[in-house]
Amino acid sequence: MKLQSQALPSSDAFKANEAAHLKALETVREVAEAAALGGGDRSRARHESRGKMLPRERVANLLDPGSPFLEVGAVAAHGLYGGAAPCAGVIAGIGRVQGHEVMVVCNDATVKGGTYYPMTVKKHLR
């Protein structure tokens, strides 16, 4: 079965929509990239000075080497709490551990010492 579409890729409307979509997608990628840094340089340095692995390092060490990790909610809490809760303070996603697909939820202590915000709870429960 072939899906039919009325979209005309050569039309001005299509091109305008595509450009707007690509611009919005780039914004989401930039926000997700910034959020992946966690609580900022100072918090990360404090965490490392205590001999602790950073949250994304913990996730990487948990997962099977070379296996994919599909992060969900990477931009959760964006624009909330004065920017103090990147990723809502929790890294969540689907990965592979010993060959099994698993859901991973990792608290990010670099974000306000691991404080849970209302969006953290919402993301965690989702």
Kindly give the residue locations of the regions a language model identified.
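Terminal-region recognition feature
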Residues: 1-126
